[in-house]
Structures are given as C-alpha cells and as structure tokens.
Amino acid sequence: MNLSAKTVVVIAIGAALYGIGGLPMFGIPVFANTTLKPAMAVLALFSVLFGPLVGFLVGFIGHWVTDLFAGWGVWLTWVLGSGIVGLIIGLFPSLTRNRLEKGDFNMKDFALFVVLALLGNVFGYGCSAFLDTILYAEPFTKVFTQLSIIALGNTILIAIVGFFILKSVAKRNKQSRNLTEA
C-alpha cells in the first residue's frame, strides 16, 4: 500500500480530531462504558470526503488515540469497530459517483449517507460487541445494549451534523466549479 503525502496528512489530521474529540470530556455518557461522541461527525466527514481507506484509518487510529488519552486502556475490539464504521461510510463517494465533489447533494444522497452510517455503526460496533463476548467474556446483554445505544445514537448524530456539513461542502464545491478566469 503506497499512500501519498496528502493522504497521510489527511489521515493524521482526521485521526487527531477524531481521537481528541472522542475523549469523555467531549461526549455524553449514556450507559456503562458507553459515550455518544460528537467526534463521530468528524469520522463521517473524513470518510465521505476521502473514501473508505482514509475512513478506516481515521476511525482505527483516532479511536486508539481516544483510548490512550482516556486512560482506560486500548480496547482493540472497539478500535476495530470505529475503523469499520469509517470504511463503510467511506463507500459514499463511489456509490454516489462523486456527486458531492461536483456540488450535488440531494435527499437521495442524504438517505444513502444515513443508511451507510447506520450500517457502519451496526456492523462495525456489532463486530466489537461480538468480539467482546468472545475475547473478554463480557456479558452479551451488556454489549448488545451498548451496541444498540451507540448504533442508534451515532446514526442520529451523524445524520444531523452530517446533513449541514455535507450541504455546505456541496455548496462550496458547486461555487468553486463555477469560477472563471477574467
């Protein structure tokens, strides 16, 4: 895998923003060891703008950073889950044929964005919950409750914040495509 310097910088910035933004002081505690993080919007934005590989690495590295700085140890199962969330949301550009890059973001695109966010959260953190029961002998009901809360909460948060951000990105992209030289 050969990443360009630009891609490495984008991953580093995204992971830092997601990692620091994911700290407990910026989140809303909702259940045992479970926090809704506004930083999920950062992960979604980087995933949509730069694709599945960047989304995966921003989620994976960023969650690792969160766990390191939070002081509770790195939970690789949930680190992997964040990576999977970024990867799945990162499919958005290819599924929409890069319409956002061209300045288009309609309600059909928004619906796809929300579906990808939901699928990413369910599948990504579903893997985390499953692995927690296998590797750490966590109670199934606990991790299933965590998964349910996180998947729904993150999807709502990503949908609300993401709508406004992606509308703004589309508007900016449309304006920059209309520039002409004098």
From Swiss-Prot:
Belongs to the UPF0397 family. Pfam families: ECF-ribofla_trS (PF07155). It comes from the Bacteria. It is a multi-pass membrane protein. Keywords: Cell membrane, Membrane, Transmembrane, Transmembrane helix. GO terms for cellular component: plasma membrane. This is UPF0397 protein VIBHAR_05109. The chain crosses the membrane at residues 8-28, 41-61, 72-92, 110-130, 146-166. It is found in: Cell membrane. Gene3D superfamilies: 1.10.1760.20.
